[in-house]
Amino acid sequence: QISHAFLDTKFSAFKRGAQPRLGDFISLTEYATDIPSHIAFPLQSLKNGLGEYLAQQNLSQLRIAETEKYAHVTFFFNGGEELAFANETRVLIPSKKVATYDLTPQMSALEITQHLLVDIKEKKYDVIICNFANPDMLGHTGELQATLQAISCIDQCMGEITASLKQHGGEAIITADH
């Protein structure tokens, strides 16, 4: 984290150059316990989040992602809790084993999509929570062409998924995690 570069006197990951004298340092949230800073928004326990609410309503829910984003649809979506709620099914699709994702821009999106198409057709779940990793992970590579390939892949996948939802009476909310 960049916070270490500002606050850790023994920081050596890269050359910092001139160091400004800081009057104070405030982090938006607590990223790590070893960062000596004030916290603007301390961690809070999330109660009755969407996953918990769905469980209370006895609705079945699928959480699906590949390795790189699995925690986003499970741990983080459940308010920092590792345990699954009642009627919550988790599917982890392994991420491709490559040195950098620009070598495989589609990552595991096609496998996730195929899994979703089967579940949508079978009307297996009341709610599906899915995270496609490629737009974020490829964007971080800085490789524009590979990122465009990732976006094209997701566009194709989302087209198939939304067509299947429409055909089988489902609905979708499509958003980004950041």
Locations of regions flagged by a protein language model:
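Active-site His/acidic residue clusters
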Residues: K124-C157
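A residue-level signal for conserved active-site and pocket-lining positions in enzyme catalytic cores
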Residues: F75, C130, D177
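Active-site-proximal loop/turn and secondary-structure-junction residues that shape catalytic pockets
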Residues: E81, N134-D136, A176-H178
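Loop/turn elements at helix/coil->beta-strand transitions in domains of secreted/extracellular proteins
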Residues: K123-D126, H168-G170
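His/Asp/Glu-rich, glycine-adjacent segments
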Residues: Q1-K124, H140
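Metal-dependent active-site segment of extracytoplasmic phospho-/sulfohydrolases and closely related
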Residues: Q149-H178
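Glycine-rich, histidine-containing beta strand-loop boundary motifs that form or position
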Residues: A65, F132, I174-A176
